[in-house]
Structure formats: structure tokens, C-alpha cells
């Protein structure tokens, strides 16, 4: 059984890491997938990789400025107009920052909040415009275990992800009357480019504290997205699912 057969799906941050793993998994399960990336070059590279893996499937790609509601709405609207609807929006794009409170700059803090919180808000807002009349849809937001427990390695990232969790829970309660579900996923330490970009000493400390003695694979997070986007999760909304291997920052 293909869990998301013919579901029109957009994945931000879909060119690598968790987002790219989700794109592959959703295609394999019958979805019509569009990916958003940071640059058009990055998007084109990912599209070429997906075309090689799934030559019979059409995948669309865009590189909107996620901090601009108009830019995100234009890209989301293009997808919805082409297929006649939007079923699943996965707001997965984000950046990290590892400055502690006493050293974080105002500019860096504003930047991570703009991308990680405003970017998710803009994606959710745009998706809602395409889902509200049909009274159906699922919005999935990537949070983080650090948004629940905080982190000693930095203040900006966990603050932004706590914002994503608050947005998810509040929006989920507000728009369930339109039969639109909103769910967060809070990964632990995942083996992605973002994690590999951490300072070696921080990554080493992370690995020492992992109860599973390994980082999670992007596919393990994508599996949860697939379930949440499917009709099997029809009763789940306004909550955040932790996929953290018992890790606590």
C-alpha cells in the first residue's frame, strides 16, 4: 500500500538531508512532489538526482526566499495551480547557530529567527491559503528536540525551534475546523550536512551523549513524515512528535 498515493506534496529544504530523504520516500509512496531549496543551482542538482532515481516521475523545484511571504506564496501557488490542489506541506528548511547567549550577535539571532520561524510561518500561511477551501490538508513542521529541552551549545537554534513548536500547536488548534492538520516533528541528532557542519568538539560531545550510540538517519525522520502525512494519522494534530533516540541535549 502506498501511503500518500497522488498526494500533492511540497517539501522545503528538500534538496538535501532530511528533506531529500523525504522527497525520495514520498515519491516511492505515490506522491507528486515539489522541492524548495536555497538556490536554483542546488534545486537543479537535486532534481537531476531525483530524475535519475525516478525517471518516470515529474518533480518540480523552486528556490523562493522563505523569509518573504509573497515569494513563498508564489511558489506554493504555482504548485497548487498546476495540480489543482495542495495536500501536504512539509516546512523543513532551517539553519543552525551555535553561539551561547553571552556571545550571540543581534544580527545572527534575527537571521536564525527569520529563517527558522518566519520561514515556517510563511510556508504554513501559504499552504493554508491553498487548503482552506478544500477543507483538507496536512502541514508538517520540522522542530527539534532542542526546542523542547534547550541546549548548552547555543541559544538561537533552540529558541527558534521552540517557536516552531508553539506555532505548530497553536495553528493546529485554530485550523482543525477546516479539517487541516498541523503536526511538528522534533528530531534529535541526525546525520545531515547541518550536523556535519557543527564544530568538531560539539559534535564529539553529542556523540558521547547519544543513548543509541549513533546519529539518526535522515530516513528515520522521513518515515515519520510519511506516516503523519498519510490517512493513518488522521487523528493527530496540534502536537509535536519527538524522534530523538532518547537523546536529551
Curated annotation (Swiss-Prot):
Catalysis: reaction(s): a 3alpha-hydroxy bile acid CoA + NAD(+) = a 3-oxo bile acid CoA + NADH + H(+); choloyl-CoA + NAD(+) = 7alpha,12alpha-dihydroxy-3-oxochol-24-oyl-CoA + NADH + H(+); chenodeoxycholoyl-CoA + NAD(+) = 7alpha-hydroxy-3-oxochol-24-oyl-CoA + NADH + H(+); deoxycholoyl-CoA + NAD(+) = 12alpha-hydroxy-3-oxocholan-24-oyl-CoA + NADH + H(+)
Taxonomic superkingdom: Bacteria
pH dependence of function: The direction of reaction is pH dependent in vitro. At pH 7.3, clearly the reduction reaction is preferred with an order of magnitude higher velocity than the oxidation reaction. At pH 8.7, the velocities of the oxidation and reduction reaction are comparable. At pH 9.9 the velocity of the reduction reaction is about 60% of oxidation reaction.
Gene Ontology MF annotations: 3alpha-hydroxy bile acid-CoA-ester 3-dehydrogenase activity; bile acid binding; NAD+ binding; steroid dehydrogenase activity, acting on the CH-OH group of donors, NAD or NADP as acceptor
Summary of the function given for this chain in its UniProt record: Involved in the multi-step bile acid 7alpha-dehydroxylation pathway that transforms primary bile acids to secondary bile acids in the human gut. Catalyzes the oxidation of C3-hydroxyl group of CoA conjugated bile acids generating a C3-oxo bile acid intermediate. Can use choloyl-CoA, chenodeoxycholoyl-CoA, deoxycholoyl-CoA, and lithocholoyl-CoA as substrates with similar efficiency. Highly prefers NAD over NADP as cosubstrate. Also catalyzes the reverse reactions; in vitro, the preferred direction of reaction depends on the pH.
Family membership noted in the UniProt record: Belongs to the short-chain dehydrogenases/reductases (SDR) family.
Further comment found in the protein's record: There are three genes for BaiA proteins: baiA1 is identical to baiA3 and encodes a polypeptide sharing 92% identity with baiA2 gene product. Reaction mechanism seems to proceed via a nicotinamide-OH(-) adduct, which is proposed to be involved in proton relay instead of hydride transfer.
Protein known as: 3alpha-hydroxy bile acid-CoA-ester 3-dehydrogenase 1/3
Amino acid at each position: 500500500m502506498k501511503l500518500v498515493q497522488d498526494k500533492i506534496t511540497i517539501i522545503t529544504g528538500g534538496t538535501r538531508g532530511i528533506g531529500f530523504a523525504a522527497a525520495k520516500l514520498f515519491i516511492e509512496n505515490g506522491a507528486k512532489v515539489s522541492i524548495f531549496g536555497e538556490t536554483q543551482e542546488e534545486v537543479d542538482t537535486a532534481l537531476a538526482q531525483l530524475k535519475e532515481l525516478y525517471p518516470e516521475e515529474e518533480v518540480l523545484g523552486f528556490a523562493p526566499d522563505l523569509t518573504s511571504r509573497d515569494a513563498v506564496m508564489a511558489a506554493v501557488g504555482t504548485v497548487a495551480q498546476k495540480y489543482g490542489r495542495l495536500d501536504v506541506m512539509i516546512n523543513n528548511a532551517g539553519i543552525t547557530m551555535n553561539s551561547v547567549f553571552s556571545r550571540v550577535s543581534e544580527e545572527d539571532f534575527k537571521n536564525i529567527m527569520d529563517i527558522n520561524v518566519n520561514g515556517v510561518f510563511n510556508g504554513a500561511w501559504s499552504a493554508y491559503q491553498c487548503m482552506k477551501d478544500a477543507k483538507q490538508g496536512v502541514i508538517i513542521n520540522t522542530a527539534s528536540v532542542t526546542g523542547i529541552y534547550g541546549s548548552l551549545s547555543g541559544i538561537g537554534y533552540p529558541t527558534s525551534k521552540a517557536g516552531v513548536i508553539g506555532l505548530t500547536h497553536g495553528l493546529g488548534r485554530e485550523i482543525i475546523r477546516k479539517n487541516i492538520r498541523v503536526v511538528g516533528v522534533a528530531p534529535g541528532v541526525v546525520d545531515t550536512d547541518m550536523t556535519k557542519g557543527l564544530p568538531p568538539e560539539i559534535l564529539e560531545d553529542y556523540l558521547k551523549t547519544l543513548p543509541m550510540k549513533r546519529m539518526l538517519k535522515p530516513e528515520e525522520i522521513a518515515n515519520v513524515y510519511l506516516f503523519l502525512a498519510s490517512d493513518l494519522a488522521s487523528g493527530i494534530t496540534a502536537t509535536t512528535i519527538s524522534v530523538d533516540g532518547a537523546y536529551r541535549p
